[in-house]
Structure formats: C-alpha cells, structure tokens
Amino acid sequence: VVYTDCTESGQNLCLCEGSNVCGQGNKCILGSDGEKNQCVTGEGTPKPQSHNDGDFEEIPEEYLQ
C-alpha cells in the first residue's frame, strides 16, 4: 500500500491524486489497476524529507499519545 504526501495543514490530511483531500483521521490509498484512490480510516503518512525546509510541521502532541 502506498500513501500520498500529506498537506502542510495536518499530518493526517493526505492528498489523493486529483486533489482529493482525505479528512482528519483518514489516509489515502492509491488505487491500482485503474481503481480510484480511496480515503480510509488511519493516520496519514508524512511526506519524505526530500523537499524544501518548511514543508513540514511538527506532529501535534495529541497525536503522539
């Protein structure tokens, strides 16, 4: 399963392809074999740190408990 980048506004607000945004508490699963991407329950995956500084936010304390 592959997840897309998370948005800056929240670690678990993850973008599906085509600018579909999964709401808080959901993550995006990329569809395979022509299937559409789906938002499912689960923590978002942060984007890899190969972009610019400032693309990342600290994960809020409440998510770490």
UniProtKB/Swiss-Prot annotation:
Region named Disordered: 39-65
Annotated Acidic residues bias: 55-65
Interaction with fibrinogen-binding exosite of thrombin as annotated region, ranges: 55-65
GO cellular component: extracellular space
This protein's record includes keyword Glycoprotein: yes
Glycosites: 45
Intracellular or extracellular location(s): Secreted
Outcome of mutating residue 56 to I/L/T/V: Strongly decreased affinity for thrombin
GO biological process terms held by the UniProt record: negative regulation of serine-type peptidase activity
Entry keyword annotation includes Disulfide bond: yes
Primary role: Hirudin is a potent thrombin-specific protease inhibitor. It forms a stable non-covalent complex with alpha-thrombin, thereby abolishing its ability to cleave fibrinogen.
Record's protein name: Hirudin variant-1
Organism this protein belongs to: Hirudo medicinalis (Medicinal leech)
